[in-house]
């Protein structure tokens, strides 16, 4: 019973205690309320035991009718069981009376003090947040990022937030399933070996090029390196559309940090689906806001991977995320060129480094954009720090976009590590022929030649056949 009482919030316990006739409940703390309830239970148990012992003594006296004695003992046992049932029923009735009938569904954020809140709007604090008690968090092994579905208790005038009365599902599963899950950190990371096809009927040439030059696998840690106005946001939108079309079961989270509000609306309207979430923090928000949103998103993705699901995060951009951490992190006393604190890179690296393919099942793919040649030394330092951490790079060239060559992909500099695990033997051979052919060319010439060849073919299969047949670009 102790566990049952501890799983309830203090206000629910207080109401239960009042209904049982316990006095001075308003001044009691939760621990005192639990003890008082247990003492009341013990008192009732003693009374019940005393009654039963009296009946036994009566039955032990010599009687002319043993049959009647058996009947009396059976009746007393029935009465005892009925009393227990009545107690449980009264507790259930009390919980039903406290139930507001309002169902809450949102993401949990566990605070440092042990309690938590269910956030509903854009993963951030709001007026409609619901309080979750520390006992509920401990009992069900809840973590930040879990999606909680349950009913709230009737809110009193003194309370600022509604409180969670009971939980029905966690991440769409029964609460008993959640306690058996493994931690994200305990899963085994391996190289991406399942390909995410970006080419689809009616897809742009950009997706066909990326599918061959820089193939993306489940669990890829990719970086889209771009100068301003090179078309990185358009490319991200194309990738998102291709992923939702080719992998509808994959959970897609688009995280926009320090972006323009109109771009947020554009992406929200352009990419829709059951497994698509667009989370944002626009440039007019505080750096703390950017930091909090990004941490909630990565925790949400980890919880999904723990359930062996495939998740993809499209982050725009990791440079601005690092800038936000640079403004919020306590100064370490050291400074890199451009005014960047080395301690500010820890959390963005944790975010980017969370991408991995799991041997036990599930994967987390992160594609992040990085800005270069912005005129800020800090942006270049951030890019250099992240350069060796990814296993896929897609480089966009502003010179190509200025010449109106789209997509402005620098094919020479773009590529994927261990692409042999993702490409077919025919595709691998065609890519090698292409790379050898344009090795001595200028970037714009190589891209224009390849675009002409892509324009002459309907799909990548025809393109590969043409490259293998001609042996030259």
State where each predicted segment sits.
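Short flexible coil/turn linkers enriched for glycine and charged/polar residues
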Residues: 100-102, 110-114, 124-126, 142-146, ...
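Phosphate-interacting basic helix/loop segments used at nucleotide- and nucleic-acid interfaces
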Residues: 96-104, 205-209, 297-302, 351
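P-loop NTP-binding catalytic core
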Residues: 154-224, 230
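Flexible glycine-/small-residue-rich
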Residues: 37, 108-112, 120-122, 134, ...
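P-loop NTPase catalytic core
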Residues: 231, 240-243, 252-274, 278-473
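Charged, low-complexity terminal tails
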Residues: 1-101, 123, 128
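N-terminal "pre-motor" subdomain/linker immediately upstream of P-loop NTPase catalytic cores
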Residues: 83-178
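P-loop NTPase nucleotide-binding module
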Residues: 202-259, 298
């Amino acid at each position: 019973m102790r566990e049952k009482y501890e799983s309830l919030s203090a206000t629910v316990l207080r109401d239960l205690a009042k209904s049982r006739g316990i006095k001075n409940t308003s001044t009691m703390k939760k621990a005192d309320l639990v003890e008082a309830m247990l003492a009341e239970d013990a008192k009732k148990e003693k009374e019940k035991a005393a009654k039963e012992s009296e009946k036994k003594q009566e039955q032990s006296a010599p009687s002319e009718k043993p049959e009647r004695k058996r009947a009396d003992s059976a009746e007393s046992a029935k009465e005892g069981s009925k009393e227990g049932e009545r107690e449980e029923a009264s507790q259930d009735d009390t919980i039903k009376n406290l139930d507001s009938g309002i169902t809450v569904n949102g993401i949990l954020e566990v605070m440092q003090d042990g309690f938590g809140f269910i956030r509903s709007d854009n993963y951030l604090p709001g007026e409609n947040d619901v309080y979750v008690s520390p006992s509920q968090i401990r009992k069900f092994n809840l973590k930040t990022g879990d999606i909680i579905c349950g009913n709230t208790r009737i809110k009193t005038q003194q309370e600022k937030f509604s409180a969670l009365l009971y939980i029905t599902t966690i991440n769409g599963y029964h609460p008993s399933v959640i306690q058996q899950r493994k931690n994200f950190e305990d899963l085994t990371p391996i190289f991406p070996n399942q390909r995410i096809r970006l080419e689809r009927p009616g897809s742009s040439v950009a997706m066909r090029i990326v599918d061959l030059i820089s193939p993306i696998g489940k669990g890829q840690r990719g970086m889209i390196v771009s100068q301003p106005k090179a078309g990185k946001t358009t490319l991200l939108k194309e990738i998102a559309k291709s992923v939702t079309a080719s992998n509808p079961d994959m959970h897609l989270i688009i995280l926009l940090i320090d972006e323009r509000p109109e771009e947020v609306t554009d992406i929200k309207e352009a990419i829709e689906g059951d497994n698509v979430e667009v989370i944002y923090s626009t440039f007019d928000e505080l750096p703390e806001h950017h930091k909090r949103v990004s941490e909630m998103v990565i925790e949400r993705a980890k919880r999904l991977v723990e359930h062996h699901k495939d998740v993809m995060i499209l982050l725009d951009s990791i440079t601005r995320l690092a800038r936000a951490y640079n403004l919020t992190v306590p100064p370490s006393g050291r400074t890199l060129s451009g005014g960047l604190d080395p301690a500010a890179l820890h959390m963005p690296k944790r975010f980017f480094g969370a991408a991995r393919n799991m041997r036990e099942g599930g994967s987390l793919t992160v594609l992040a954009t990085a800005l270069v040649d912005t005129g800020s030394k800090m942006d270049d330092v951030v890019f250099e720090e992240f350069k060796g951490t990814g296993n896929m790079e897609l480089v966009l060239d502003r010179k190509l976009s200025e010449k109106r060559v789209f997509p402005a992909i620098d094919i020479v500099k773009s590529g994927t590590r261990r692409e042999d695990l993702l490409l077919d033997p025919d595709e691998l051979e065609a890519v090698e022929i292409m790379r050898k052919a344009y090795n001595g060319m200028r970037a714009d010439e190589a891209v224009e030649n390849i675009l002409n060849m892509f324009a002459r073919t309907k799909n990548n299969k025809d393109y590969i056949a043409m490259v293998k047949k001609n042996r030259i670009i």
